[in-house]
Amino acid sequence: MDEVIVELKERSYPIYFDYEGFDRVGDLIKKHVRSSKTFVITDSNVYPLYFEKIEESLRKSGFDVLYEVIPAGETSKTMEMAQRLLEVAYDSGLLRDSSIIALGGGVVGDIAGFVAATYMRGIDFIQIPTTLLAQVDSSVGGKVAVNLKKGKNIVGAFYQPKMVYIDTSVLGTLNKREVLGGLAEVIKYGVIWDFDLFTYIEENLGDILRLKKEDLTYIVKRSCEIKAKVVSLDEKEENLRAILNFGHTIGHAIEALTGYERYIHGEAVAIGMAYEARLAFNLGYIDEGYLERILNLIKRAGLPADYEGIEKTDMLNAIKLDKKMREGRINFVLPVGLGKVDIVSVKEEDVLKVLK
């Protein structure tokens, strides 16, 4: 079993990489929590696939297991759902030394983490991500949140898990769309930090899309190493961590304007990366050759690079509602070189020029 540590001094925690199913997960979790009472939050897609295996491992390790199944999808990530889960936790007798386990993708991790962060001012939290996107991105770093109708992740906190358990064998049960959505975040890491990873994806895309074990294992672990490094250097997104938002400024606007239903998160991020790369080219930060490599990789991966049916002014207004707006200008993470990005304050008129 491989391991990567997110270094946060006394709050450091491990990311475990396992490839043999969930037999060991109960014993691993036992090392990192304070009591045997745990509340597993999962969704309607993941529950029939993995809950019994997780429950069996937890019970063998002496855990008293409660669980709740929420509807799959972004529309479950609401204050109303969080309140329901908080009430279930209270009615079930969860105490301050109890724990919450997120078993699922990014939505489950976000809302379960939000519940863990707020219940009794914070109880132990464990991440078991089951989608590629959650494994490479949302399960690591402690961002937890719910959406409001007008914006994504508006209500949330920084709340680090006690551990993350990643088993890449579960990715074989994902539909192709979910795999591609996760791959968008991996491409992001190549653009913002590690151009060797970008090149690796270009050269091994076929094997990655066929879910070849060696290639999946490499891109998942490398992505986690990059995110762990960034989070260790800037936990609360005061400066460096903002680079992880490449593609997300426009991506979040697209999600909000389409009601979180037309595009899954990774698809919206892919479109966001494409437009933010075009913006970087228009402003002179990258040359046409690099722009084309970014756009071509997004398209070769089967991801969208354009949005449909959204007016320019609506898009601009949604971008301005995002958390990245400062003093009349919009902060974008833009590529400025191979595997390098910078935070750039952009005028509204320059944003309008690049939008459809």
Curated annotation (Swiss-Prot):
SUPFAM superfamilies: Dehydroquinate synthase-like. One of its GO terms (biological process) is chorismate biosynthetic process. InterPro entries: Dehydroquinate_synthase, DHQ_synth_AroB, DHQ_synth_fam, DHQS/DOIS_N, DHQS_C. Zn(2+) binds at E185, H248, H265. Pathway: Metabolic intermediate biosynthesis; chorismate biosynthesis; chorismate from D-erythrose 4-phosphate and phosphoenolpyruvate: step 2/7. Keywords: Amino-acid biosynthesis, Aromatic amino acid biosynthesis, Cobalt, Cytoplasm, Lyase, Metal-binding, NAD, Nucleotide-binding, Zinc. It is found in: Cytoplasm. Catalyzes the conversion of 3-deoxy-D-arabino-heptulosonate 7-phosphate (DAHP) to dehydroquinate (DHQ). This is 3-dehydroquinate synthase. The gene is aroB.
